[in-house]
Amino acid sequence: GGIYDSAEYDKAIAWAREHLTIGENRNLPANTRTQEEYDRQFEYSIKMVLVARDLMEGNPRLAELGYVEEAGGHNAIAAGFQGQRQWTDCRPNGDIMEPLLNTTFDWNGKRQEVVFATEGDACNGLSMLFNSVLTNRPQLFSDVRTYWSPEAVERVTGHQLEGRAAKGFIDLRNSGATTLNATGQERDADGNPVIKPWWEITEEEIEADLRATTFHAANAEYFPGGGFSTHFVTAGGMPVTASRLNFVAGLGPVLQVSEGWTIELPDEVRDTIESRTDPLWPTTFFVPRLTGQGAHASVYDWMANWGANHTATGYGHFGADLITLASMLRIPVYMHNVPPERIMRPKAWIPFGTADLESADFRACAAFEQLRTVAGDQHVVTRAAVQFVAAAVLACREQFGAVFAKVAEERRAVEVHQAAVGRDVNAVAGQYVVAVAAVVLRNGTRFVQCLRCAVV
């Protein structure tokens, strides 16, 4: 039963059985299920991928099967899944669905990632969306799990941190929703670990990402309904940017931005750190760029000032682009570590202050008013607002030059992909899309829908 394309499911489950490696099961004997039950849960999890994608994008095949309404989808550019606890207490979790949607390949080959947040966190979903449309790269959804100080690491492992990790690091760890591209198995021309735009990834890199990932029976103490969790270790040395959109009553959305790097630890040290939480979840160690003052005075200060236990993290140092985008949307940025010479805000910001620019951001955004209307408890972006942002991005082609340089190549890649899979994947297709979203609740799942404006 269920509303999905059974023919595509057959293709998907065959691919999953061949390419997804099932790792060890660490459940206690009393919580361990039979192999037949794990097989059924694996099949159910793959069906969840199809259903979530079709809910977002639609699928004309469903109309042929008699499900005309469901075939339309919601034209969602991003989405999320609450899961805990109403769903996961009695059904398999979303920890296969979420990372596969966020990854730039599946049984149909390479494709654009589908922005998908876990735990119904619309704010982190929006952060992932902003990161995605600015970089054209898939994102990590992570818990800000733990700050590990140099003293704590040495006490529990005997290892002395050095290099970028010398002042400590953040353990970013969540059981699902982190893209499999974050393994760091993709490489640039110099052999450095990267997360590539989807059209650049090779078949060899897809295989390497999959080899570096294992799927494990979910911890029944967290997920009584079962399912699977994803594990890999993110390669060190990658420049990354963490962001977080928070909502403040009476103020609205506010943004945090932090550039930094991933780091690696010796295997035995990493194993000890992983065992303090859950060793079967994705492992990413993050060090923010420290400034010696404010929220970036130390790694601990970064964690203490972060607005939630979730963060959206993407490849590259693109904090300046996020700050510029936030100014267009009238979203104040109240914490960042981007060097001032890289930041471009509208000149109209100057009369609101030149010394304390974070405070000036709040005054300017209040004066110019945030570009949205309010419908009930939902923040809805107006078409005029999106058109304004699109025009502003056009005026800032130099700032966003790297994105525009990929337009022609991306269009060709999308056309090839559409021809290969025989369906519209609702990809960017040569358009730079500025997307701002409103949260819509449907069937217990948070869908982030948006108006779009293409500007090429």
Segments the model singles out, each with a brief description of its role:
Residues 6-35, 45-368:
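Anaerobic metallocofactor- and corrinoid-dependent redox/one-carbon enzyme cores
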Residues 1-5:
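Generic multipass alpha-helical transmembrane bundles of integral membrane proteins
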Residues 369-456:
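Charged, low-complexity amphipathic helices and coil/IDR segments
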